[in-house]
């Protein structure tokens, strides 16, 4: 294409050619066409930006699997983070090779390189995990605050697969059994015998929707003597899949009354 610009006398003067370059962030979820699958991204130019919604030093980020009937792998929690898109439209579970590699601070805006990273898609519900990351995959990290998050407020029944691995505020929910502690089990099953690594607590709303809030056995506020919050309110957390189609991971202790 040849461009011409008008001169001072109205004549047209040929302009030097120039290139307009537009960059955009790709949706790497589209790399997997089937209902489920896995692909290794080998592209030095592959990256995405998002906001960290988990906390690297928090004990209630990922359910810790039982590697044997009486053994729990606690390293999984420390190696896991959740990063959602800047607009909150969807998110990834991010699994680092080691806890030392996971330096993602809550609310920070990050740019993550996907070169050499494995993308896994799982179905029913549809969700995505990025694994095999090291500290070197973190291109940049800028501190942020809770106000940087796009607020997504929904009822339990309005949740969809797109909400998985994003931060959502659930309206007018309450605990079905708000008595005792968050983990009403024998503590001996936790640290001594390692039979139990996580306890779900049921939340429900006025529309009959239910969802489990997951509490790991290393969570400091699981049993601190102050009991559980009673009454209806808004509870915020990360939507995940664990046994049930959708569950909620709460990073900090729910406030009393139940508003956060």
Feature roles, as predicted:
Residues 143-217:
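Short helix-loop boundary/capping segments
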Residues 249-260:
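Single conserved hydrophobic/aromatic residue that forms the stacking wall/gate
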Residues 4-22, 30-34, 76-98, 116-120, ...:
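Secreted, disulfide-rich extracellular signaling modules
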Residues 103-124, 168-175, 230-245:
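Flexible glycine-rich surface loops and low-complexity tracts that mediate binding to linear polymers
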Residues 1-72, 143-147:
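Acidic/polar, low-complexity intrinsically disordered N-terminal segments immediately downstream
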Residues 54-93, 183-216:
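OB-fold (S1/OB) nucleic-acid-binding surfaces
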């Amino acid at each position: 294409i040849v461009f011409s610009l008008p001169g001072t006398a109205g004549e047209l003067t040929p302009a030097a050619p120039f290139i307009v370059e537009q960059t955009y962030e790709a949706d790497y979820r589209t790399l997997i066409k089937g209902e489920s699958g896995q692909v290794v991204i080998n592209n030095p130019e592959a990256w995405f930006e998002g906001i960290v919604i988990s906390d690297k030093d928090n004990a209630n980020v990922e359910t810790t699997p039982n590697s044997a009937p009486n053994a729990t792998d606690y390293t999984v929690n420390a190696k896991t983070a959740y990063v959602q898109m800047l607009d909150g439209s969807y998110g990834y579970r991010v699994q680092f090779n080691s806890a030392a590699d996971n330096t993602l601070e809550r609310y920070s805006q990050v740019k993550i390189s996907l070169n050499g990273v494995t993308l896994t898609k799982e179905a029913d519900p549809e969700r995505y995990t990025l694994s095999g990351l090291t500290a070197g995959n973190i291109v940049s990290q800028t501190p942020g605050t809770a106000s940087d998050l796009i607020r997504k407020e929904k009822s339990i029944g309005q949740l969809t697969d797109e909400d998985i691995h994003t931060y959502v505020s659930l309206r007018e929910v309450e605990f079905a059994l708000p008595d005792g502690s968050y983990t009403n089990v024998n503590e001996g099953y936790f640290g001594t015998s390692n039979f139990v690594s996580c306890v779900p607590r049921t939340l429900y709303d006025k529309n009959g929707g239910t969802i489990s809030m997951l509490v790991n056995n290393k969570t400091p506020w699981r049993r601190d003597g102050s009991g559980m919050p009673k009454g209806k309110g808004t509870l915020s957390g990360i939507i995940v899949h664990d046994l049930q189609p959708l569950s909620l991971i709460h990073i900090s202790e729910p406030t009393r009354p139940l508003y956060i």
